[in-house]
A protein has these predicted regions:
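Short, flexible, surface-exposed loop segments at domain boundaries
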Residues: 2-8, 13-71, 82-125
């Protein structure tokens, strides 16, 4: 009987951790730039756009430690952070990314050598 409760407990923990990861991904649209719990500043880059290349689907960004090329793939999500303007955030596209915009980039598997999983672009009021 004790073994059954142990197995049930392990399954519950596994399901809870999977659900929280899914919840983070589905709610990321609504979290302002730089405020993603457990991600911002640790597993993301925050900086400014210095170049947008629509032909190659890349953004060049810069932060205090250097310049980075950010590759995008068809599943890369772009979120427009309009919280400073008092407007609701929305989904965006590469065309919404402008030189000088503040951005936050989360890479696939937290590896800067991989494409972006998502990009948040802060739109000024």
């Amino acid at each position: 009987m004790k073994t059954n409760w142990t197995i049930i407990g392990v399954i519950a923990i596994l399901l809870a951790t999977q659900a929280s990861g899914f919840a983070q991904k589905t709610s990321e649209l609504f979290i302002p730039l730089g405020q993603s719990p457990g991600l911002s500043g640790k597993h993301t880059l925050i900086g400014k756009i210095v170049q947008v290349n629509a032909l190659n689907n890349t953004i060049t960004m810069a932060d205090t430690s250097g310049t980075y090329s950010v590759a995008m793939v068809p599943v890369t999500r772009i979120y427009l952070d309009k919280s400073k303007a008092g407007l609701p955030n929305s989904q965006g596209a590469l065309a919404d990314c402008k030189v000088g915009d503040s951005i936050e980039v989360k890479f696939v598997d937290n590896a800067r050598s991989k494409p972006a999983e998502w990009i948040k672009v802060q739109k000024a009021p």
